[in-house]
Amino acid sequence: MDVPFPLHRSLSCTSVSNAITHLKIKPILGFVSHGTTSLSVQSSSWRKDGMVTGVSFSICANFSGRRRRKVSTPRSQGSSPKGFVPRKPSGMSTQRKVQKSNGDKESKSTSTSKESEISNQKTVEARVETSDDDTKGVVRDHKFLEDEDEINGSTKSISMSPVRVSSQFVESEETGGDDKDAVKLNKSKRSEESGFIIDSVIREQSGSQGETNASSKGSHAVGTKLYEILQVDVEPQQLKENNAGNVEYKGPVASKLLEITKASDVEHTESNEIDDLDTNSFFKSDLIEEDEPLAAGTVETGDSSLNLRLEMEANLRRQAIERLAEENLLQGIRLFCFPEVVKPDEDVEIFLNRGLSTLKNESDVLIMGAFNEWRYRSFTTRLTETHLNGDWWSCKIHVPKEAYRADFVFFNGQDVYDNNDGNDFSITVKGGMQIIDFENFLLEEKWREQEKLAKEQAERERLAEEQRRIEAEKAEIEADRAQAKEEAAKKKKVLRELMVKATKTRDITWYIEPSEFKCEDKVRLYYNKSSGPLSHAKDLWIHGGYNNWKDGLSIVKKLVKSERIDGDWWYTEVVIPDQALFLDWVFADGPPKHAIAYDNNHRQDFHAIVPNHIPEELYWVEEEHQIFKTLQEERRLREAAMRAKVEKTALLKTETKERTMKSFLLSQKHVVYTEPLDIQAGSSVTVYYNPANTVLNGKPEIWFRCSFNRWTHRLGPLPPQKMSPAENGTHVRATVKVPLDAYMMDFVFSEREDGGIFDNKSGMDYHIPVFGGVAKEPPMHIVHIAVEMAPIAKVGGLGDVVTSLSRAVQDLNHNVDIILPKYDCLKMNNVKDFRFHKNYFWGGTEIKVWFGKVEGLSVYFLEPQNGLFSKGCVYGCSNDGERFGFFCHAALEFLLQGGFSPDIIHCHDWSSAPVAWLFKEQYTHYGLSKSRIVFTIHNLEFGADLIGRAMTNADKATTVSPTYSQEVSGNPVIAPHLHKFHGIVNGIDPDIWDPLNDKFIPIPYTSENVVEGKTAAKEALQRKLGLKQADLPLVGIITRLTHQKGIHLIKHAIWRTLERNGQVVLLGSAPDPRVQNNFVNLANQLHSKYNDRARLCLTYDEPLSHLIYAGADFILVPSIFEPCGLTQLTAMRYGSIPVVRKTGGLYDTVFDVDHDKERAQQCGLEPNGFSFDGADAGGVDYALNRALSAWYDGRDWFNSLCKQVMEQDWSWNRPALDYLELYHAARKLE
């Protein structure tokens, strides 16, 4: 086995050109070990004194037990090596084996040569040859074989392998003479005592021929030591064959070889090639032939070689560190590291000169740091004092593969620090992550952590839910057991009373044979036909059961004529049921459902005791158990049905939200859209923009300005990007990469790179949500200050908006609170967790604050102790203005004193309008400066002066539909503020109006079974109101009977529907008595003339309204003006088709099937109803006639339209998104 002694660097420190002649050393052919590893070193200067200046070697020996190997070694250019003439082998014990395998060796010589040719470098090898005759011999003769042809030439680096001193069995003959004072290249003399051949590599020396310096002296010493060690007798026990077949030296020989290596290392520590050598090349082992057995002691040999290598590496490291320590000490630098080039996923040793640090008087020195600007993997460890010259302390730190720099400070473990004069210490990691890659890595780590936390939270919730389910199931089981026990007791009481009346037999009317029987016995039951009301019956049947008809009619038998002659006796055979205590029966003239005459013992039925029945106690235990099982099964079925319905509802909600988001993104497709539509974090997205539909129409250039996360992303706004023309018409496009931590993409467009005219969506900017990001949008805090809230204090639509909008925004992961007066007429049964919160004083009045949950929303109830809200009503007091003004001021004071700092304060209509100016005048500079005011107009008919003042002070203002906002834009209180005035359509509460879970309709339904559900609802409505049960078109009208609602158009539509053979149902009442009486007269007229096709219900009925929405084919809403309108939205939720006048919110939500296809497409919708323009009879006829004709002539198309409108989302999902955009726009304002 070859035991290499590798060098990590050149043994000589420098290579200086000499004037003397240099030898070019050529490889020895034929005897080079096939496992030789090449090493690049400098050419050696040949000194006249013949001393070896540097040696790299290994010792190997092949004993007679090894087969010979034919090795082909690559030759260098030049003359052939001299000497080494093959010799005949001497007698040896393994000669026959060698000869036998000679043929095999010949066939393997080619592969062995290839192995030697792996290195492209020139190799030099020296060999010590031993024979079997004398393995203990000592090398005594040294011959240097010179290559005269290569004497002249300049100094050049040559490539050679680590030189070996090897022992190998060879067949050769001695050639040449002995010269023990000089060793010549390419010649060798076999020592007769040992048979060793020595090949030495001559290292290049610095200086001229006559110059003698420390390096040359060291080289001379190495040569001397080599010579001395080769004079030592090698004992057999000092040799051990390794798994490569070579011999490893042990004992004095190995020790002296190690000393030579160390001496060489000390003399050449300044080599420039220390870091460039590939140490792995020194440790390649000889290949082992497949049929060559492994020698014993292989493990020990390998460990010894490894130990030698590690020891040499440690020496090299120590010497390099000592050099760095000396250099930094001389320069007064207190910090260095080794290795000097720090790489990722490796260890680095950090050295601190405590004497030059602020810690020079401290006994403990610690390092505290982290990687990548203190953002990754912090560490703290103690430094230890070193042996280096100077007060050097050190520690090792592992550099993670994600690092691009390390940052650290030193301290004494308490309060004394060395932080590089406040700048901290840092080390750059070469080849580490780029900063942007590390940012993405951190984001991915954060995402994984979030996923982990989410899974853990989900598991905790699952376990908690499972525990709740188990506890609830236990409670339900106990409840079922109690109920079973109670029902069994009731049955027991009844049966005992019946058993008292029951008899064993009655000879005159009936009897049983045999008289003694038990359960499951077959008996004959005889009946005397002549004794009762069936004396004239042609046939006789028994209808029977047991135990007070426990299982209903379980015995049905036809009786036959008996042979008994003392009466008209008939009989039948009956099997006594199991568990029967007594039998119950009646006689009839026919089977069930066909019998006419009965004999039921004068309405008491017949009863007969089973004489040998089971013990009663046992029966009642079993009965109670059966009742319990029945209750359990019924409960299981109920819960399964309920679970299925809940899951279906949740699925529908999710699908509806997804459709709404898609329609939200497509609603601006005529201006801008993206590919893909759903933007994913970490991917690229292309933005398409159509300037033809914007203020940038006709501009020669369009520039795209983009950022993320509401313009707050860490990367800041991206550089402006010039958009390029797209393939589709007037669109232009730009592509950007979406960061991993993006949750929103924000952009605007401009005509020039430096600005000019902007399209920023009227100050709102364009925003598109990003999905799959590691960052989530931080929640906003919105506070509604209102005087109405459904369902606890609802008067009109304002209360619905406050509750429904708040729930929708809260569902989008924002924080919502509501401040409401504590009326004495609140519906407290809808308030959960109601409790006292605090009290405070304002305006000389104590105000108590209560807290509760309403529809899942946090509500603070303000109760001033001056009695302003103890009037038994919401509106209707003479001092309503004073009451609500006080409430608005008190609400702002509550926010201030309570430490609230909401992002948005949202006030509604005239009643909470004072919040806007009170905030700006008294609170914006006193702790609530962060907040922005949003004001919503629900009804412009009341408090116009208050609304105008609120418009002036609000940051953003809205009304309940875009069209209505245009219709009122000319109003004097609105016109000056159009720049901040927006229309957002209201929504409906999908939980209140839900045909799948509506308890007021006969069959729950969705869009999948809309025809079945609406058919059943129509039939139920017709039955309830006494209308004709016929398949006719039914028009429903649900409204307040006021002139705003178009009562003259309503009357005309009723007559038109009846003329078209339809049915009409109206539900509503009039606040004006004259109008109410007018409709009472109309109802009387219609009920007398069209009693089976018209019904006017002139008082509001909530359950009936649900049934009308579900059972009607059409819902008519002919309003003269309508700010938003919820009736048409509710109608579509139930699959009814709206017929409306084009005004306000009706125009924004209903798209005519014949005229509004393009307008609907721009909103991401499909046409969904019939509409008309005028406010006269002709307009109503135009829409209503088309609707009725569609029902009559195209029923399949009409049914598909019902399904289509049911799938449209008219909840608060979309309005909530619009309000959030408005809130964000308000927050941007200074």
UniProtKB/Swiss-Prot annotation:
Pfam families, sorted: CBM53, Glyco_transf_5, Glycos_transf_1
Stretches with biased composition (Basic and acidic residues): 124-145, 177-189
Residues that bind ADP-alpha-D-glucose: K794
Record SUPFAM superfamilies: UDP-Glycosyltransferase/glycogen phosphorylase
Pathway: Glycan biosynthesis; starch biosynthesis
Subcellular location: Plastid, Chloroplast; Plastid, Amyloplast
Origin superkingdom: Eukaryota
Keyword annotations: Amyloplast, Chloroplast, Glycosyltransferase, Plastid, Starch biosynthesis, Transferase, Transit peptide
Region annotated Disordered, chain positions: 66-189
Keyword Plastid: yes
Tissue: Tuber, sink and source leaves.
GO MF: alpha-1,4-glucan glucosyltransferase (ADP-glucose donor) activity; alpha-1,4-glucan glucosyltransferase (UDP-glucose donor) activity; starch binding
Enzyme class, broadest EC rank: transferase
Compositionally biased region (Polar residues): 152-170
Catalytic reaction list: [(1->4)-alpha-D-glucosyl](n) + ADP-alpha-D-glucose = [(1->4)-alpha-D-glucosyl](n+1) + ADP + H(+)
Family (UniProt): Belongs to the glycosyltransferase 1 family. Bacterial/plant glycogen synthase subfamily.
Role played: May account for most of the soluble starch synthase activity in the tubers. Contributes only a tiny percentage of the granule-bound activity, but may also contribute to the deposition of transient starch in chloroplasts of leaves.
Annotated protein name in UniProt: Soluble starch synthase 3, chloroplastic/amyloplastic
Protein's organism: Solanum tuberosum (Potato)
